[in-house]
Amino acid sequence: CDVGMLLSADMDYQDRSEIIFNEIKRAHSAYKLNNGIIKIYHIGRNKKRIFDANVYFWNGIIWENIKIHTDFKKSMKLFSDGSGKKEYDENFLRFKNGNNESTRNYFHCFCDIVKNVKDKHTGGIPQLVGLYNGSKFNGMYHGTIVDGQAYYQGLKMGNIYGMSNIRWYNENFEICDWNTKQREANAMVQPISKRATP
């Protein structure tokens, strides 16, 4: 997005991370009121096409560039944060069965907590971004269908022409048809994870 001014296509993730981190520190130093906590998450791929992640963390005094562990052999949560973190983490402990540690299980839990969260600063419509391995892909926004209504990046979508080229998912993490708002006929059924009794 910087049109080659700071980053180049041949840079490794670590080089990009250091440049971005230093630019954030430089820009932040111009603010007079900067004693609050700030966290900025950065996820990308290295030259081996493996995901890397960092959090750029301002603790009110100094900046830190902290690496997030990403070397997993199966779907895992990289982090949870924000005012809804505690409820999400507690809620996820109750989501278990054959779907445990699957991508859809994390999404089921996320949709459930967004709908039923007690924290007044958390809520709204789930927003979904896909990060894919392979040289042809970068981050891609996906649409979500909640209670028969389509949303894209959290915004309600009417019957807008051209939205069929976006991949749509319902709360079950099933691929849906943009026109019908229903699960596509050939899409895999993704049953909701059963909650364990407390």
Feature-to-residue mapping (PLM):
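N-terminal nucleophile
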Residues: 1-198
